[in-house]
């Protein structure tokens, strides 16, 4: 047990320590300063020339968003065409068939918005061709899209007054070539050394220790897993994700993959401070996020390593904790750490089954996604926190009788309305769709039965499974309580709608706020200015997040995870 706790502590320390130099590097990349990765410049120029991009052309916030949305619309069509025709495409040695239109819609939307919700199993639901030219391609593009959006916001924050926020295409390309690709190559090399497969052969036929014949899938796993983790994507190459011994063979690969989930989101927060020359602001935001993350780790590690009281009542020893749904080679501690790490970000990959975690652990996992502000996805995670900063500035200004200002710009009714709409959209979408699914399940049992029955667990946990699915979709996470039978018309279409609403409306709102503030006249700091880089303001922001985001979900948790915990 002590060894497991030590492993958890080492991973967290590595994340925090290495996030600092990476944050400095990311800030320099987006500022256009000289870095070791300048050798990528000729490749970038070729990309710009082929695509007809002028990287020096500045965009206002409307042009920036237009480019972002056009890019996503194009790749959606690309993905749909390939997924519904993959059975006839090359690199398909196992003869996997095409996806149905509803499943392809859900898959394509899910990976296009960086969620990676999977209503299929990777070994049989995709081919090597679509794994590479849809899934892996989208995992680079969507991660870079979020990073580009944050780069534009950082540029607007650093300027005293400007009409432009940078070039979306330029930020997108350098996010791939100078940040995501180099890190992916390093992680991929480690995975190959540890035994993760990398090739294009079909299934292997093996004889197990019991003498049974078994077919084992392989493929270009080591190429896809690194960006799956680093881009906070999370879509597993195999159906059970990083629980699979070929996707995550050893404790070392588990540490590397878990580290990969959080390193860029952490670094992006620190990059904000370096880019804007306001390090104290970056540190204060980082501190709030780290506090919330560590609180979740403390709860989940304690819950999972403490075991299940129902099993203890039967007189069965649980020296290794609550091991249901966990890999013996990894242990309860490492699985608990991963469960928090993957949900404070929009990653969603798993190394154990969240459906089998203790009720309070499941509540923490869901709350991380429902708050959707602690580190979050690469780039987009900080933008969600930015929304609450605007709200906290406005509320604090009203409380002390000062004009609300953020970084020398007045925060007025227009910005506050957008921020409020974005903040309330998240709980609204989750709770409304959960209510709809619960209503359909209760009042239309024939329809539900025609789709396989949906729930493998009734009662409190059945509600948790439905709530988790929509929470994961809205938070662009992609993990799930897998007791839910989700590859149906109802879940494919409704989750797809939630994915679209919860990805693009917040990004549009957040970039719009940044663009509107950037255009305003800069007001120098004075004795009456509300400082936003202090511990007091950090606590105020945390309080606003807790009240607006967390408490919105208390009633539904009282009916699901909390009720289940009290029933043990």
From Swiss-Prot:
The chain crosses the membrane at residues 3-23, 64-84, 133-153, 179-199, 255-275, 281-301, 375-395, 418-438, 497-517, 535-555. InterPro entries: KdpA. The keyword NAD does not apply. Pfam families: KdpA (PF03814). Signal peptide: none annotated. Its main location: membrane. It is a multi-pass membrane protein. It is found in: Cell inner membrane. Keywords: Cell inner membrane, Cell membrane, Ion transport, Membrane, Potassium, Potassium transport, Transmembrane, Transmembrane helix, Transport. One of its GO terms (molecular function) is P-type potassium transmembrane transporter activity. GO terms for cellular component: plasma membrane. The keyword Membrane applies. Part of the high-affinity ATP-driven potassium transport (or Kdp) system, which catalyzes the hydrolysis of ATP coupled with the electrogenic transport of potassium into the cytoplasm. This subunit binds the periplasmic potassium ions and delivers the ions to the membrane domain of KdpB through an intramembrane tunnel. The system is composed of three essential subunits: KdpA, KdpB and KdpC. Belongs to the KdpA family. HAMAP family: KdpA. This is Potassium-transporting ATPase potassium-binding subunit. The gene is kdpA.
């Amino acid at each position: 047990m002590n060894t497991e706790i030590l492993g958890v502590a080492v991973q967290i320390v590595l994340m925090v320590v290495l996030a600092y130099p990476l944050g400095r590097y990311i800030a320099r990349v987006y500022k256009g300063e000289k870095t070791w990765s300048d050798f990528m410049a000729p490749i970038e120029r070729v990309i710009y020339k082929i695509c007809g991009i002028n990287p020096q052309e500045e965009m206002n916030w409307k042009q920036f968003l237009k480019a972002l949305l056009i890019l996503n619309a194009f790749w959606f069509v690309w993905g749909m065409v390939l997924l519904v025709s993959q059975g006839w495409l090359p690199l398909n040695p196992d003869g996997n068939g095409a996806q149905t239109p509803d499943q392809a819609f859900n898959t394509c939307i899910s990976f296009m918005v960086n969620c990676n919700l999977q209503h299929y199993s990777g070994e049989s639901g995709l081919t090597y061709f679509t794994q590479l030219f849809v899934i892996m391609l989208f995992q680079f593009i969507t991660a870079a899209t979020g990073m580009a959006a944050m780069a534009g916001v950082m540029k607007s924050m650093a300027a005293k007054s400007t009409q432009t926020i940078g070039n979306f295409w330029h930020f997108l390309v350098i996010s791939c070539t100078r940040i995501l690709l180099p890190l992916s190559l390093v992680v991929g090399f480690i995975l190959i050394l540890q035994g993760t497969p990398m090739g294009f052969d079909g299934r292997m036929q093996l004889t197990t220790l019991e003498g049974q014949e078994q077919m084992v899938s392989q493929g270009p796993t080591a190429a896809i897993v690194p960006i799956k983790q680093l881009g906070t994507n999370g879509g597993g190459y195999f159906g059970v994700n990083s629980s699979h011994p070929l996707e995550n063979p050893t404790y070392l690969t588990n540490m590397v993959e878990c580290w990969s989930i959080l390193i860029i989101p952490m670094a992006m927060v620190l990059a904000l401070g370096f880019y804007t020359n306001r390090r104290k602001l970056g540190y204060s935001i980082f501190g709030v996020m780290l506090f919330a993350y560590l609180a979740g780790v403390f709860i989940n590690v304690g819950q999972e390593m403490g075991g299940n009281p129902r099993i203890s009542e039967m007189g069965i020893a649980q020296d290794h904790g609550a091991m249901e749904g966990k890999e013996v080679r990894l242990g309860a501690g490492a699985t608990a750490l991963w469960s928090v790490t993957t949900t404070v970000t929009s990653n969603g990959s798993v190394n154990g089954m969240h459906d089998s975690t203790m009720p309070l652990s499941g509540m923490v996992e869901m709350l991380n996604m429902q708050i959707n502000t602690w580190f979050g996805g690469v780039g987009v995670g900080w933008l969600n926190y930015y929304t609450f900063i605007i709200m906290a500035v406005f509320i604090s200004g009203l409380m002390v009788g000062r004009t609300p200002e953020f970084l020398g710009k007045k925060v007025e009714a227009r910005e506050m309305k957008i921020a409020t709409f974005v903040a309330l959209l998240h709980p609204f979408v989750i709770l409304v769709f959960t209510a709809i699914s619960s209503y359909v399940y209760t009042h239309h049992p024939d329809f539900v039965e025609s789709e396989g029955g949906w729930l493998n667990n009734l009662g409190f946990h059945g509600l948790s499974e439905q709530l988790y699915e929509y929470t994961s979709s809205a938070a662009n996470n992609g993990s799930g309580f897998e007791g839910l039978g989700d590859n149906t018309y109802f879940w494919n279409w409704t989750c797809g709608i939630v994915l679209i609403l919860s990805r693009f409306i917040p990004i549009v709102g957040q970039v719009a706020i940044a663009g509107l503030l950037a255009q305003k006249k800069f007001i120098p700091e004075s004795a009456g200015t509300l400082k936003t880089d202090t511990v007091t303001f950090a606590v105020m922001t945390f309080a606003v997040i807790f009240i607006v985001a967390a408490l919105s979900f208390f009633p539904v948790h009282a009916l699901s995870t909390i009720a289940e915990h009290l029933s043990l």
